[in-house]
Design a protein with these regions (language model features):
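Cytosolic covalent-transfer regions centered on His/Cys nucleophiles
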Residues: 1-158
Length: 158
């Protein structure tokens, strides 16, 4: 099951998350984590060109860190010709340096991929995601989960 949403339809965060795009991260650098999450999306059949998407993520990070604070990063890349958005989630047990705006290490990485021609839909997705992650209890729950199924329960109904 893939976690995609057609950018012409409404979405919920729970509709964008699926078990095949959630992982417990083992990498200890931002670049390696971006690669790991890109690979996850490619294996789920969401990327025709994983390498190009990965390079786009690195280019975006070089402009400005996507570490939004609160232990969260939301890297994102645009995919030419894509009709769908997807969200991949990586959870890191210890946290890594990400040059986040609050200086804290990052433990939750939400990778967004989607069409380059749907900026308003992307902003709605980003807004919904950041609003959801402002909930300290939800972030705390995500940091305590042990299984992908537990992650899915945290986002049920969101």
């Amino acid at each position: 099951m893939s976690c995609i949403a057609d950018h012409k339809q409404a979405f919920t965060l729970s509709s964008l998350l699926s078990s095949d795009l959630i992982t417990f991260l083992h990498s200890d650098t931002r670049e390696d984590i971006l690669f790991e999450l890109s690979e996850l999306a490619a294996k789920a059949g969401l990327l025709e060109d994983r390498e190009a998407f990965f390079r786009a993520l690195l280019a975006r990070e070089s402009i400005m860190s996507t570490g939004i604070g609160m232990g969260v990063a939301i890297p994102h890349g645009k995919i030419e010709g894509s009709a769908d958005f997807f969200v991949a989630l990586g959870i890191h047990s210890k946290g890594i340096l990400w040059d986040a705006i609050d200086g804290l290490s990052v433990r939750l990485v939400f990778l967004i991929g989607g069409p380059s021609d749907a900026p308003s839909k992307y902003l709605k997705l980003l807004s919904a995601l950041t609003q959801s992650l402002r909930d300290e209890a939800r972030r705390s729950q995500l940091l305590q989960v042990q299984t992908v199924e537990e992650v899915m329960r945290v986002f049920s109904g969101v």
